[in-house]
Amino acid sequence: MKIWIDILTPKQLLFSEQIIEKLGKKYDILCTSRDYNEVSKLAKIRNFDLIFIGKHGGGDEKSKLKASIDRMEKMSEKIKTFSPDVVISFCSPEAARISFGLGIKHIAFCDSPHANAVMRLTLPLIEKLLIPHVISKKEFSKYGIDEKNIIQYKAIDAIITIKRRINRNAKLPFKKNNKKNILIRVEEEQASYTSKPSKIIPIIKKVVSEFEKENVVVLGRYVEQIKNLQKIVGNKTKIVKMSYDGKHLLENTDVFVGSGGTMTAESALMGIPTISYNAVPNIIENFLVKKHLVKRETDPNKISMQIKRIFEADDKQSQKRAKIIRSQMEDPIQKLIKIIKE
């Protein structure tokens, strides 16, 4: 059997790694992506074999459309030649359209019903959709997929991505001293579901001024974004691009301040004290807050106070809670294997 996996984000790459680990010996797997800085860098770090076709459309709607059409055109020939029996994606619009056009079974994972444009473009064309149990099927069925084709798994996606092996000898951006490491992740700016102005600038300024004696590292996403941050914050803190493995960074972090996305979920399940400034409100972040694995705070002063409390407490509560939650989760890839065999 031949399987095609289309990978568009770093999280999808890490998730796919575990799929390949379980299916790679048995099946012929082709992995594609688009030219997108964070994915290509992570693929290098992880030594992950990817074929890059097309590019990321950026933040503008017209350029997104052009990039998607261009990618579909280039990729459809490649896929026709490869002739897969099954397509796996994370709701890739190009994979949805190509698999529909070529009559190939398409199985997708998704935990982002808030990504309205992507849901509308993909869900009506997908055969089976796998979702975390904490999200209601109705959140997806409203976009045109029948509820009977939605399969829930008792886990969130971070349970898969934190399983990855990492190189613990790799270089890190933190200084080697006895100070606390504070890692701040800047929010996504170019996704179709992002429209609000940045929340992170006042948070960075406050944390940098309050904790100047600690190791504060800001993790950016795009070159332009990093340049803008450097102009605003200056040389008061280290601003880096994502040329590190997130798990390795988190293992060496005392407090993580995230936007509520993938790294926030990974940090929480790893038992790292985690604060979310909730850049894009979503159901997974909500679940983690309810389970007391994440503190949600948007006010820079209150975030600063939370960090102080975490440093003063210095207990293992986060790790204990995370261990309990992890033990209650199942492996979503086993559900995928079952569907492939059907």
Go through each PLM region and give its residues:
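A conserved, positively charged/aromatic
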Residues: I107-A108, M119-I131, L250
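Conserved nucleotide-sugar phosphate-binding/catalytic loop shared by glycosyltransferases and other
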Residues: K26-A67
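A donor-sugar binding/catalytic signature common to diverse glycosyltransferases
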Residues: V87-I98, A108, L249-N286
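A nucleotide-sugar donor-handling region in carbohydrate enzymes
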Residues: L130-P197
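Catalytic donor nucleotide-activated moiety binding site of glycosyltransferases and closely related
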Residues: I45-G59, K205-V240
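Conserved donor-nucleotide binding/catalytic region of nucleotide-linked donor-dependent transferases
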Residues: I307-K323, E342
